[in-house]
Swiss-Prot record:
<dbReference type="InterPro" id="IPR036365">
    <property type="entry name" value="PGBD-like_sf"/>
</dbReference>
<keyword id="KW-0732">Signal</keyword>
<dbReference type="GO" id="GO:0030435">
    <property type="term" value="P:sporulation resulting in formation of a cellular spore"/>
</dbReference>
<dbReference type="GO" id="GO:0009847">
    <property type="term" value="P:spore germination"/>
</dbReference>
<dbReference type="Pfam" id="PF01471">
    <property type="entry name" value="PG_binding_1"/>
</dbReference>
<dbReference type="GO" id="GO:0071555">
    <property type="term" value="P:cell wall organization"/>
</dbReference>
<keyword id="KW-0378">Hydrolase</keyword>
<keyword id="KW-0749">Sporulation</keyword>
<dbReference type="InterPro" id="IPR036366">
    <property type="entry name" value="PGBDSf"/>
</dbReference>
<dbReference type="InterPro" id="IPR042047">
    <property type="entry name" value="SleB_dom1"/>
</dbReference>
<keyword id="KW-0961">Cell wall biogenesis/degradation</keyword>
<dbReference type="InterPro" id="IPR002477">
    <property type="entry name" value="Peptidoglycan-bd-like"/>
</dbReference>
<dbReference type="InterPro" id="IPR011105">
    <property type="entry name" value="Cell_wall_hydrolase_SleB"/>
</dbReference>
<comment type="similarity">
    <text>Belongs to the SleB family.</text>
</comment>
<keyword id="KW-0309">Germination</keyword>
<protein>
    <recommendedName>
        <fullName>Spore cortex-lytic enzyme</fullName>
    </recommendedName>
</protein>
<dbReference type="GO" id="GO:0016787">
    <property type="term" value="F:hydrolase activity"/>
</dbReference>
Length: 276
């Protein structure tokens, strides 16, 4: 009788311990997204978590405010690219799962800072920046979202609608039929030249520099670009550079310049070889 009672108590203790373990595990489970697909224009807690996790990983540099604007959209696309996912700018279940796996989210801290109106960051691997001051008094800091005015066309800061159109023309003329990544890479080369002292400092100057682009020489620059070409330009402007910081590219099947073969090669995407 005594032995039976003792065995019963041991089993009871073990079961109680397991129950407490799983209860605690469930209670301390990392907060994660709801089931909705989060997309541009969305607002609320899911967007706050999305922005915080993207910022934790270094993809989002804007204000964590729960508003899914352009800054959040492009940060999400860059995350999807870097993690080898479908690049659609939508936070579906696969993307959310990968974000949860790759980042941490301190919901209590973020919620507290937002409720207090503080300026703060949520970057991983470093001290958080909280100045304790409200954002309600204005300020000149760039939030990473389109907060100023209401432009008729969404154009990234620093570029005119004409710049976007001209670059889309160049990408379409130079790289239509190439993989999307290759089209973004061509747009990135234009931007890399724009930021190099070796080339003109305007989009039109780079594109129309003599003998710079085949599409200008053969007139294909004036073909009407499709939406994919424009999207490739916007992806490049917002930080995606599949070219590896290339300044040149060429098609080895059609290149007639011996000089281009002397350039250090970075990679090949589709039919184009990208070079330093």
């Amino acid at each position: 009788m005594h032995q039976s009672y003792k065995a019963f108590m041991i089993i009871l203790v073990v079961c109680s311990s397991l129950t407490m373990y799983f209860t605690q595990t469930d209670n301390t489970k990392t907060y994660a997204f709801s089931d909705q697909v989060i997309q541009q224009g969305a607002v609320g807690e899911d967007v706050i978590e999305l922005q915080a996790r993207l910022q934790y990983l270094g993809f989002y540099n804007g204000k964590i405010d729960g508003v899914f604007g352009w800054g959040t959209y492009w940060a999400l696309r860059n995350f999807q690219y870097e993690f080898g996912m479908e690049i659609d700018g939508l936070a579906g279940q696969t993307t959310k799962d990968k974000l949860v796996q790759a980042s941490n989210y301190d919901k209590e801290y973020v919620t507290e800072q937002i409720n207090k109106g503080n300026q703060f960051t949520h970057y991983g691997g470093g001290d958080r920046n909280t100045d304790g001051q409200s954002n309600s008094g204005g300020g000149s800091g760039n939030s990473g979202e389109d907060t100023g005015g209401t432009p008729s066309v969404n154009v990234p800061q620093g570029y005119s609608q004409n710049d976007i159109q001209l670059m889309a023309n160049a990408v379409y003329g130079e790289a239509r039929g190439e993989p999307y990544e290759g089209q973004v890479a061509v747009a990135a080369v234009i931007l890399n030249r724009l930021n190099s002292a070796l080339f003109p400092d305007t989009v039109s100057g780079v594109i129309f520099e003599p003998r710079a682009f085949t599409a200008v020489a053969d007139g294909q620059i004036w073909l009407e670009p499709n939406d994919k070409a424009r999207e490739a330009v916007l992806d490049a402007i917002n930080g995606w550079d599949p070219s590896g910081n290339a300044l040149y590219y060429f098609n080895p099947d059609t290149a007639t310049s011996g000089w281009i073969w002397t350039r250090p090669q970075i990679k090949q995407i589709g039919k184009h070889i990208f070079c330093k």
